[in-house]
Amino acid sequence: MPIFRYALGLLVLTLAGAAAAHAGPKAAIFPFELIDVSLEGEHAGQQADETARLQLATEELRTLAAREAGYEVLDLSGLAAEIESTGPFHKCGGCEIDIARKAGAEIAITGAVRKISSLILVVQILVRDVASGKVNKVHRVELRGNTDETWLRGVRRLVSSHAGGG
């Protein structure tokens, strides 16, 4: 019986080590931001449906980054107040790095949706190395249409491009 327990213990340790060895980088994924340069945005400001789409896109990015790109996506909810007060990240030149470091991340991913008009949008993600603060990759896709489905399609294309090394 002691040999069985020993063998079982070794198996558990081996499997745990193998799982840890295959875990991807720890990623701090920050909420998408809207950069609205459209005439509509100038007059009406950010719309409730676009605010909801930002959250939808962020959740989709987090899900796909773990599932498709193999990242260990970190929970940033404990840093929500700091994230809110620090942004917008698309203007700060890497200010998200300190927050990502606090979360224990190896990479920081920020995203932005630039709304040019009701029909033309550009979705972008920027991936930074937390240790150096340098930008590793920038991925962007153009969208035609301002709907939940087009935003989700854009995020999926970004992750597919990133996971494929493109």
Indicate residue ranges for each PLM-predicted region.
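Positively charged n-region of N-terminal signal peptides that target proteins for export
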Residues: 1-5
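Bacterial N-terminal signal peptides
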Residues: 6-17
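A short alpha-helix capping/helix-coil boundary motif
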Residues: 9, 39-42, 75-78
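C-terminal/domain-edge helix-coil "capping" segments
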Residues: 22-39, 56-59, 67-69, 94-102, ...
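Short acidic, glycine/proline-rich loop/turn micro-motifs
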Residues: 39-45, 85-86
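Charge-dense, low-complexity intrinsically disordered segments
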Residues: 44, 48-52, 145, 149
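N-terminal, post-signal-peptide region of Sec/Tat-exported proteins
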Residues: 48-79
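Short, solvent-exposed, polar/charged sequence segments at loop or secondary-structure edges
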Residues: 67-110
